[in-house]
Amino acid sequence: AATLLGSGVYQAGIASDSTGTSTLLTVVSEHPLLSAGVNNLHLANSAWGGFTLLDAGGDAMRWARSALSAGQLSHQQMLDMAAEVPPGAEGLLFLPYLTGERLAEHTNSRAQFFGLQRKHRQPHLYRAVLEGVALASLRNLQQLRRHAQEPEAMIASGGGARSPLWLQIKASVYNLPLLQTRNQENGTTGCAIVAGVGVGLFSSFAQGVSRTVSIEREFTPDPRQQEHYLRCFELFEQLYRQAQPLYEQLDVISSFSFSPDEGTPQ
């Protein structure tokens, strides 16, 4: 709640994308959002924040750094490489369910790349990971949209908010303006606002936000990218649903254990 307040998300019509290890999407409403897969928290000004969770948000890029570059590339180098690839990663999709899904029906979901071809290189994979997190988050955002007022804009926070490329991808995928705050320490700012209201420094939470939170940059949806990402999402959704029956079979396969020497040729 403090992070939401410290990023300026405190009244109906505003949404939040908080991407750290996970990605939490929150839509502020005047009432709780009663839906499976949606949790609610009570905000400081008597509003409610309905939120969804994608377990592997920023953690997907952390995995990509470890698995695809053996930790040799910095996150900024990965982002620079991804920026060289066109939207859609030339037909490569990534489902980012590296650790399953805590708040979904299928907690044993798995991650996968789909559409790999010989032409694809590291930059394509990095771009696909960024886009895959955004597309998976769009699935969650649609749950919120079905039960809440359509947000006018979304404010980004967390480590993921430091990447202009990722924010532009998300703006086009969500089809929402995505705002980047000047101060990225949103949780600390939110706590300061609460303290300021408590001691009378601010007359209201709204005044506290207006005096401490400012927008650095706005990322607006690109119409051509948004149309292309919509087609990508339709395929993403098919992959997500059609893969679900296979996860139990994969659980059985992965439950077999072998000693290390059994995999070594004699």
Positions of PLM-derived features:
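Active-site core segments that coordinate phosphate-bearing ligands/cofactors
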Residues: 1-157, 161-261
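Intrinsic disorder/low-complexity segments
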Residues: 263-265
